Amino acid sequence: MAATEDERLAGSGEGERLDFLRDRHVRFFQRCLQVLPERYSSLETSRLTIAFFALSGLDMLDSLDVVNKDDIIEWIYSLQVLPTEDRSNLNRCGFRGSSYLGIPFNPSKAPGTAHPYDSGHIAMTYTGLSCLVILGDDLSRVNKEACLAGLRALQLEDGSFCAVPEGSENDMRFVYCASCICYMLNNWSGMDMKKAITYIRRSMSYDNGLAQGAGLESHGGSTFCGIASLCLMGKLEEVFSEKELNRIKRWCIMRQQNGYHGRPNKPVDTCYSFWVGATLKLLKIFQYTNFEKNRNYILSTQDRLVGGFAKWPDSHPDALHAYFGICGLSLMEESGICKVHPALNVSTRTSERLLDLHQSWKTKDSKQCSENVHIST
């Protein structure tokens, strides 16, 4: 019989100091990069996302040395949907989630192979780029022009984004993915920013949280996606007034019971310790939450045998909740965990490496411009 909410709350470990079993979580993420259990088979087309949870989790635990970085980088580049020689598929470029289509292995920047069903997926492009930066790659083999062209093709007239060019649901999740892609590539030509901002603004609900779209229910995940997107754009305080931001802060801070839930009257769930916690961090009021209750709830979902975190106590751990549980603990500066960048959802070490990359691109572009001017004169 499933545990009631009261039983879950009672089992949250409040009042006792629970240990964070770092080494077991390292081994859990290692296994996620190898052979996955049968129950993960339906996620084969999203394997790159599972790799992101594992790699970023290891990065947060300062344990990337346990993986073969070069092999994984080659695998990720083999998932890049590259332009064909005639560039007829430019609006389909990005990263796919795995090799399920049987496209020839091609980790280079050579022209892609035409396939009628091959296209990038917006979430896979986001996680693929994130993984490359996490692993220390310089993104030199990323066809940035093609990724941005593929991204532009996914934006709808209302400012939201689809996941794939054939069409799919369109909501705040993919606005966030698009914002991360543009931020990582240091090029916002991949979207009509004004339309995206309008979409985020119209998604504010009557109770002051953000929904997946206009007229829908406020949700902790979509509130994070909207607020984080605006922070990456550098537009948060331009879009919402101080009064509106205070209302959003109140909605978010009311999501804490012991851990956090995503909507009123819903059970708490490990992943919202990041989704809502990171939003509060971006809004600069995370320090007013109850760290002890949140920590105890997260650790009550820790699998003490195999590592990882579940959404609820006494449930099976999975890659998503394992990663976001660690990120939630990072927001509270748990010992043994690196700091997380609350908007980009990677370690601050990785975000700083990305800024160094941006600076090197800028220096390279300036040098090329100077050389071109010198040649023309």
From Swiss-Prot:
What CDD domains does the annotation carry? GGTase-I
Query: What's an example GO BP annotation here?
Result: protein geranylgeranylation
Please tell me one Gene Ontology term that the record gives under cellular component: CAAX-protein geranylgeranyltransferase complex
Q: Which reaction does it catalyse?
A: geranylgeranyl diphosphate + L-cysteinyl-[protein] = S-geranylgeranyl-L-cysteinyl-[protein] + diphosphate
How is the co-factor bound, per the entry?
Binds 1 zinc ion per subunit.
Subunit info here reads: Heterodimer of FNTA and PGGT1B. PGGT1B mediates interaction with substrate peptides.
Protein's recorded name:
Geranylgeranyl transferase type-1 subunit beta
Cofactor(s) recorded in Swiss-Prot or TrEMBL: Zn(2+); Mg(2+)
EC number(s) of the enzyme?
Answer: 2.5.1.59
Swiss-Prot/TrEMBL keywords: Magnesium, Metal-binding, Prenyltransferase, Repeat, Transferase, Zinc
Known function: Catalyzes the transfer of a geranyl-geranyl moiety from geranyl-geranyl pyrophosphate to a cysteine at the fourth position from the C-terminus of proteins having the C-terminal sequence Cys-aliphatic-aliphatic-X. Known substrates include RAC1, RAC2, RAP1A and RAP1B.
Q: Where does geranylgeranyl diphosphate bind?
A: H219, G220, G221, R263, P264, N265, K266, Y272, S273, F274, W275
Q: Which gene encodes it?
A: PGGT1B
**GO molecular function (one):** protein geranylgeranyltransferase activity
Q: Where does Zn(2+) bind?
A: D269, C271, H321
The PFTB repeats extend over: 144-186, 193-234, 245-284, 291-333
